[in-house]
Amino acid sequence: MRITIASPRCYAAVGKKENQEDSLFPLKGNATADTRVFMVCDGMGGHENGEVASACVAETMGRLTAQQPLGTSSEMQNAFEKALQETYQQLDLLDKSDSIRKMGTTLTFLALCTDGVLVAHIGDSRVYQVRPEQGVVFQTRDHSLVNDLVAIGELTEEQAKTYPHRNIITRAIQPHQELPAKATFKVLTDVRKGDLFFLCSDGVIEKLEDDLCQILTEKLPLEKRLENLEQEALQRDTRDNNSAYLIEVTEVSGASMEAEIQSDSTTQQDETNPKAVDTDKKSRPNWLRWFFLLLTILALALAAFFMMKEKG
């Protein structure tokens, strides 16, 4: 499979924060139609700490994965995991004070491969695959407290949107972790001409989630669509940093029969589409449901201090 793309577009806005803690790879203005690796990182930790963490992760992960020759998604995943180990080491070297120790970042990653598109993420930054005639056909599932509570049936999708602790994430890239957070991977093989891949920090979703698909699929040049998205975020008084990459597929050649079969099924969505999460409490024994709830709360209480992202 050979995936051809238009020249990618990106933006990074500060929102209502004092400084920019999001980082992109490639840096704005450096991506071309030949670029095969993209990332958005959303730093946390306050002051300059989040900025340091996200910049370190974007630069290290980007540099090491972008030098990987064009190959399969399996080969790229191996390169990603090796790069992530090196990235943790780099963050450890930056950790020289108690305040810096609180820093961390999310990561969302996309690579164009010979057998499809490899997606990886840690935290609540997202990747969307949008098909103009169908809407969102894939999106990553946030590593967050609310999603864990939805998964065990304690919250519905609607309740999760207004839950007081919805900003707590359960995975992040941080220095000196005894058990370093691992990425969730997905290989997308149903890729078609006209598909859009959208990587973004959670600041984009803050006020625009319901209108995201409409804005991205407007019959306008790619750059204009992204400009409209940035302006909408500004007009709606988005508080958080908001940054994104938008990639449009212009041609797909040599697609496998597997991709054609998957295009007529829901297999691609089931694993990560939030709507596919089982929220039927009656389908789970009470003891098992409460066991997982208590386990989740205990684990997240220990991590919450490091994981709470500032939204002001």
Give the ranges of each region predicted by the language model.
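PP2C/PPM-type serine/threonine phosphatase catalytic domain
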Residues: 1-312
